[in-house]
Amino acid sequence: MKLYYKPGACSLASHIALHETGCMFEIEAVDTVTGRTEKGADYHAINPKGYVPALDLNEGGVLTEGAAVLQYIADSHPAAELAPEAGTMARARMQEQLNWIGTELHKAFGPLFREGTSETGKDEARVAVAGKFDLIETQLKDGREWLVADRFTIADAYLFVVSNWANFTGIDLARWPNLAAFVSRNASRPSAKAAMRAEGLIQ
């Protein structure tokens, strides 16, 4: 199994999840601008969409889209308990979180990373992100450590990665103390440290 990733991108969530399982896997970085992998392969031949993540399942084909990759990792390694049991309300709540993070929060950051975005456009994006963070802060105010149930799930990995982008886009997480604590809690997990170290994000 091989994960194609871009350092610090949303694929980091899948990288963290793989470390949580303790399974054997490979990683290969992708330059989404040139469309080449670090080994010189044509990434579009692997994933025609051109973005990350992509999980090569060897003879099982290539799986794309972050939420799908995360759920596959969780479901194929049930002992890691990275997702509630299928068919339960807890599972539906986790999927609800994954969908919202992907379609609302993740998307809101887009202009902040897009080349050519004007300063006005970036300011508007920061306002949009702040509104999403307000919603998360409200959820976390009840004292919960994790988004779903009482343990870490793949939804936490995804929220951590996207929320952590605030630190690179001029958004001060101190405005949302519960979210800031959530990000810190996730960053301290061995899986997150291992994945970030492998991607060259930390020493």
Predicted feature locations:
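Short, flexible loop/turn segments with low-complexity composition
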Residues: 85-86, 194-201
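Generic structural signal for helix capping and beta-alpha/helix-loop junctions
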Residues: 35-37, 183, 203
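GST-like fold's C-terminal all-alpha helical module
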Residues: 97, 101-191
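GST-like domain detector, emphasizing the conserved glutathione-binding G-site
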Residues: 1-124
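Carbohydrate-binding/catalytic loop surfaces
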Residues: 119, 201-203
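Active-site-flanking alpha-helical
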Residues: 74, 162-163, 196
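Phosphate-coordinating loops and pocket residues in cytosolic domains that bind phosphorylated ligands
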Residues: 45, 188, 197-198
